[in-house]
């Protein structure tokens, strides 16, 4: 009897340990076909120097190794710093450079590059005779220079750049001087932290509202402040082409600096104490100051307080100076914007924002300029009496573009375009710019100064058909010059000659790798310039089709269907199918039904793409439309679950009707908000046999001051937050769910804890689930080992719960 009791007890504890212990697991490899796609070389990119008559061909890097991703990383004030280089961690690099003529001939590698280049921040000089770039070595970030005519590259100075707060590399308009943010000379050693703390961390609230969204990697204590100061403090240097470097001004926590177009002044943005523990560095108190090239103060423009108490709503902005910058087409005039309505979108106001101008020598009063009825969206400067300005209102998706005369600031601007940002079919495109003699971007006119040019994606019921339009300034008439034609997907890149209407485009088709072409619009001649090879020839024969269908309430939907080689719908047995989607909120049902993507784009599968499953015998319905609509006074999320299920039903019905898919073998999947969608679908319907959720958030009460497109707080609409949270309905989960998450996810709102706690709930309630946490990975997965293992997990899960049915 004792032996039997002992045996039962042993079995119980063995089962208990098996169920609740962590699995000792190593990285796994997916099938060979998947590995080959993940390891396929990246397609080169180009940078065009029209003045130089050259094209810079840029070779891009593959996936980093887990060892690279495991390097020490400091997470401070919303940023991640590599202390070895004083730059951003997890940066992507280019690994090679070549030069070629504009006619596509004479491609030659750049000589003199370091042995293992890690290139970023490529900047042409205004005259395009030189190119500056950075190379990240093991010791720091080096400044390099490339002579365009000789193709010779060399390190410019022994000083190291400081990119903790982003790139700080800028040419002066003299074409001989480069400015950069550097590590201060004599900085000393990194602060040594005392493990014994001096006291508790204290934060207080005295009735002042400070509602902020959830941010990651914030400062936590005085030790973090010391480290932030050490790595974020930089010194501006100016360096000649001969390599002689000179400091400009004093060191500080410099966010951005920009030289004036004439190269006589600098606009310098610095962050100052006291720092905040609830917002990232870019919301810290800061100053804007004009200095000369020696660093002497010309004028302190503004001291901006910490932005931790913005009014509620996406259209809320801080009081005081915003977005100061130089007017691109004149020597040295500053402009900025200030809120007239106190930054509060709930305030009743005819005008919301106002532009101010300040001209050199900056000793006068700022000149009040144009008032905007919505929020300032940006300038495109043209010439003294001609500029374009845009405004927007996110709540109702309205955007407007105006023609504005900077020389007559009191004159009412002329409305050019007004539309909903959701309405892609009527998007007029973006006005084209060129680089002027100062090295600044300005509008590209025809030779008479009477016409402008627009490039657009050309969204249509047939998919995207990129276009080039000409806009006549006097009449306001727009005429189409060119449009991409089937069976090609061709996008305009740059107008090289407005007289000849010579255009550089990027051209591709379903099975033809993207390459760059020269196209003469008048003669309709076309010439191929680059000949990049197909990186994935093994995908030849993969079938791709854009599918259109309707939701039960009549909303048009679409998605791109990928099928394995040789599969014939209606003849072959229906396939197990992965539905991949990402919900989007709309205020217009008409806009929600618009088609996105192109049926003619090249089938290039990125390393982490779910389309890779097509090599394993699955159909993949990619980027299926999942609109969540709330017209008028209705908010989209008030019917989030119902619309989510309706979208899924429509897609499944269509694919089953086509003979592509087996109704009992569907899996739902998505990343981030798509993962949130996946968990909700599996919770609230029985349409799927499995689900795979990557890097999601599942408990919306942990993002109580808004999320995604939701402006309302948890305390205003607790029922919406609770109903939308799959964590709150974890007991309803009856479908196998694979959860993946990067252990150091820094995306706002998607803490790894979201997946950990959701899995705990599912396990505690008896659901079938598996949680995979990827070490050293952020919101997207980058290490080769992680990406391959993710695919292994996905294939194992789907083979078991779809193919195994």
At which residue positions do the language-model features occur?
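Beta-propeller folds
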Residues: 21-525, 531, 535-541, 556, ...
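Bacterial Sec-dependent N-terminal signal peptides
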Residues: 1-23
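Secondary-structure transition/capping motifs at alpha-helix termini
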Residues: 291-296, 360-363, 393-396, 404-411, ...
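N-terminal cap/lid segment of alpha/beta-hydrolase-fold proteins
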Residues: 530-573
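Conserved hydrophobic/aromatic pocket- or pore-lining residues that grip, position, or stack substrates
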Residues: 288, 334, 416, 516, ...
């Amino acid at each position: 009897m004792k032996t039997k009791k002992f045996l039962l007890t042993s079995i119980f504890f063995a089962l208990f340990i098996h169920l609740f212990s962590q699995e000792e697991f190593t990285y796994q490899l997916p099938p060979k076909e998947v590995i080959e796609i993940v390891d396929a070389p990246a397609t080169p990119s180009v940078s065009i120097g029209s003045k130089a008559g050259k094209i810079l061909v840029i070779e891009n890097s593959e996936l980093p190794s887990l060892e690279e991703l495991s390097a020490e990383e400091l997470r401070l004030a919303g940023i991640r710093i590599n202390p070895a280089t004083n730059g951003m961690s997890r940066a992507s690099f280019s690994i090679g450079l070549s030069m070629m003529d504009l006619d596509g001939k004479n491609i030659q590698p750049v000589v003199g590059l370091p042995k293992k280049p890690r290139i970023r921040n490529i900047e042409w000089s205004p005259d395009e005779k030189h190119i500056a770039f950075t190379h990240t070595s093991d010791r720091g970030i080096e400044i390099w220079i490339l002579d365009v005519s000789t193709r010779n590259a060399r390190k410019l100075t022994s000083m190291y750049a400081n990119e903790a707060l982003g790139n700080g590399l800028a040419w002066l308009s003299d074409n001989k001087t480069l400015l950069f943010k550097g590590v201060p000379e004599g900085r000393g050693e990194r602060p040594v932290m005392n493990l014994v703390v001096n006291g508790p961390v204290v934060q207080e609230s005295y009735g002042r509202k400070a509602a902020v969204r959830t941010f990651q990697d914030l400062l936590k204590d005085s030790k973090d402040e010391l480290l932030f100061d050490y790595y974020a403090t930089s010194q501006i240097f100016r360096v000649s082409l001969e390599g002689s470097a000179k400091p400009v001004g004093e060191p500080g926590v410099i966010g951005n600096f920009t030289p004036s177009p004439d190269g006589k002044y600098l606009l310098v943005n610095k962050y100052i104490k006291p720092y905040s523990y609830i917002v990232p560095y870019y919301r810290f108190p800061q100053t804007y100051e004009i200095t000369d090239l020696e660093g002497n103060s010309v004028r302190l423009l503004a001291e901006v307080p910490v932005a931790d108490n913005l009014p509620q709503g996406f259209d809320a902005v801080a009081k005081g100076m915003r977005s100061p910058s130089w007017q691109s087409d004149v020597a040295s005039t500053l402009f900025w914007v200030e809120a007239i309505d106190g930054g509060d979108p709930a305030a009743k106001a005819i005008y919301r924002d106002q532009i101010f101008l300040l001209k050199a020598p900056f000793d006068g009063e700022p000149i009040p300029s144009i008032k905007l009825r919505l929020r300032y969206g940006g300038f495109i400067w043209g010439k003294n009496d001609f500029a374009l300005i845009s405004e927007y209102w996110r709540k109702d998706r309205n955007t407007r573009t105006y023609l504005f005369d900077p020389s007559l600031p009191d004159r009412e601007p002329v409305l050019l375009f007004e539309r909903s940002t959701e309405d892609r079919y009527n998007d007029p495109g973006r006005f084209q710019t060129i680089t002027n003699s100062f090295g600044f971007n300005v509008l590209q006119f025809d030779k008479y100064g009477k016409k402008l040019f627009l490039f657009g994606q050309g969204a249509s019921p047939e998919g995207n058909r990129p276009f080039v339009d000409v806009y006549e300034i006097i009449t306001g008439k727009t005429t189409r010059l060119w449009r991409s034609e089937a069976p090609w997907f061709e996008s305009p890149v740059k107008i090289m000659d407005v007289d000849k209407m010579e255009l550089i485009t990027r051209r591709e088709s379903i099975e033809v790798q993207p390459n760059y072409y020269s196209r003469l619009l008048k003669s309709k001649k076309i010439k191929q310039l680059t000949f990049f090879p197909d990186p994935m020839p093994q995908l030849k024969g993969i079938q791709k089709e854009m599918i259109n269908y309707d939701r039960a309430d009549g909303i048009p939907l679409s998605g791109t269907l990928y099928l394995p080689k040789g599969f014939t719908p209606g003849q072959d047995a229906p396939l197990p199918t992965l539905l991949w989607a990402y919900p989007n909120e709309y205020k217009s049902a008409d806009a929600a039904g618009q088609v996105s993507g192109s049926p003619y784009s090249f089938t290039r599968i990125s390393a982490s793409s779910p389309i890779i499953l097509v090599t394993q015998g699955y159909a993949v319905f990619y980027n299926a439309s999942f609109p969540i609509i709330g017209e008028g006074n209705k908010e989209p999320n008030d019917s989030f679950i119902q619309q989510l299920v309706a979208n899924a039903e429509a897609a499944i019905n269509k694919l089953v009707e086509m003979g592509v898919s087996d109704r009992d073998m569907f899996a739902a999947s998505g990343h981030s908000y798509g993962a949130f969608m996946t968990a909700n679908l599996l919770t609230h319907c029985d349409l799927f046999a499995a689900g795979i959720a990557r890097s999601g958030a599942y408990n919306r009460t942990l993002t109580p001051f808004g999320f995604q497109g939701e402006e309302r707080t948890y305390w205003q609409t607790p029922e919406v937050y609770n109903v939308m949270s799959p964590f709150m309905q974890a007991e309803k989960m009856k479908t196998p769910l694979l959860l993946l998450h990067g252990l150091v996810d820094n995306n706002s709102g998607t803490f790894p804890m979201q997946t950990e706690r959701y899995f705990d709930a599912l396990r505690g309630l008896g659901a079938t689930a598996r949680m995979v946490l990827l070490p050293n990975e952020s919101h997207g997965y980058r290490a080769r080992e992680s990406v391959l293992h993710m695919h292994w997990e996905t294939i194992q899960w789907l083979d078991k719960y779809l193919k195994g049915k």
